[in-house]
From Swiss-Prot:
The name this protein goes by in its record: Cytosolic Fe-S cluster assembly factor NUBP2
InterPro entries attached to this UniProt entry: Mrp-like_CS, Mrp/NBP35_ATP-bd, NUBP2/Cfd1_eukaryotes, P-loop_NTPase, YlxH/NBP35
PANTHER family referenced in this protein's UniProt entry, alphabetically: CYTOSOLIC FE-S CLUSTER ASSEMBLY FACTOR NUBP2, NUCLEOTIDE-BINDING PROTEIN NBP35 YEAST -RELATED
Functional summary from the UniProt entry: Component of the cytosolic iron-sulfur (Fe/S) protein assembly (CIA) machinery. Required for maturation of extramitochondrial Fe-S proteins. The NUBP1-NUBP2 heterotetramer forms a Fe-S scaffold complex, mediating the de novo assembly of an Fe-S cluster and its transfer to target apoproteins. Negatively regulates cilium formation and structure.
Tissue spec. comment: Widely expressed.
Binding site for [4Fe-4S] cluster: C200, C203
GO cellular component, one term: centriole
BP term (GO), one: cell projection organization
Residues reported to bind ATP: G26, K27, G28, G29, V30, G31, K32, S33
Length: 275
């Protein structure tokens, strides 16, 4: 993996990771962790080996979405061994949720302690060989984002996915997120609009619960790619609540088509960053 200009990446536990993707959102509640989880599953079904690093320290929801809560993190000579969420060991996950004695325990830490854990997650987790490392970040632009960027900056290619919903208030937050990417030199892979209409489970008709097309218009104005829209889907919601593989179990759903298409576009965009 190449180092950024003026920096040198020391050999370490990210040496076998080919691509790193940060998933960002300007505000909470837009389905950022949903997109991170389903992107990882879609990439796995394309034959990729994927890791998920959950640095949303105060809201670690991905272990539940992948039915991995309660699993233990073990030590090896190279550091922490991530939790494998499938028998094939094609998706590995590291989250603060595995380090809490009680899953309902609140993480009430000051900045330095959060920074130290994020740095440890980046340097001390034995990821092995991965095609993609998906990093699920907290909402907004906080100290955790800066700590994550500083830890990952020496590694390339590194890009960001920005998740939004159609509402105007969410779009305004995404503008600030794109400004954050520009100021920190983080390349934007593209914008994803989540909750883009509701798909009826009976007739498959899509109804716009909110406005429509705002994410695509924002991407156009910002000069970044628009990767697609994901509709509200009751099957997707149920899969996340039950920790099931939506991509495998519901290939005929509208959300499946959207998510797999987005995953393919992400692969193409990350390949372009390598060239």
């Amino acid at each position: 993996m190449e180092a950024a200009a003026g920096e040198r990446a020391e050999p370490g536990n990210l040496a076998g990771v080919r691509h790193i993707i940060l998933v960002l959102s300007g505000k909470g509640g837009v389905g950022k962790s949903t997109i991170s989880t389903e992107l990882a599953l879609a990439l796995r079904h394309q034959g990729k080996k994927v890791g998920i690093l959950d640095v949303d320290l105060c809201g670690p929801s991905i272990p539940h979405m992948l039915r991995a809560q309660g699993k233990a993190v073990h030590q090896c000579d190279n550091g922490w061994v991530p939790v494998f969420v499938d028998q094939e060991q094609s998706i590995s996950l590291m989250s603060v949720g595995f380090l809490l004695e009680n899953p309902d325990e609140a993480v009430v830490w000051r900045g330095p302690k959060k920074h130290a854990l994020i740095k440890q997650f980046v340097s001390d987790v034995a990821w092995g060989q991965l095609d993609y490392l998906v990093v699920d970040t907290p909402p907004g632009t906080s100290d955790e984002h800066m700590a994550t960027m500083e830890a990952l900056r020496p590694y390339r290619p590194l890009g960001a996915l920005v998740v939004t919903t159609p509402q105007a208030v969410s779009i305004g937050d995404v503008r600030r997120e794109l400004t954050f990417c520009k100021k920190t030199g983080l390349q934007v892979i593209g914008v994803i609009e989540n909750m883009s209409g509701f798909t009826c489970p009976h007739c498959a008709e899509c109804t716009n619960v909110f406005s429509s097309g705002s994410g695509e218009e924002l991407a156009r104005l910002a000069g970044v790619p628009f990767l697609g829209s994901v509709p509200l889907d009751s099957q997707l919601t149920r899969s996340l609540e039950e920790g099931r593989d939506f991509i495998q179990e519901f290939p005929k759903s509208t959300a499946y088509s959207a998510l797999t298409s987005i995953a393919q576009r992400v692969v193409h965009r990350m390949s372009a960053l390598c060239s």
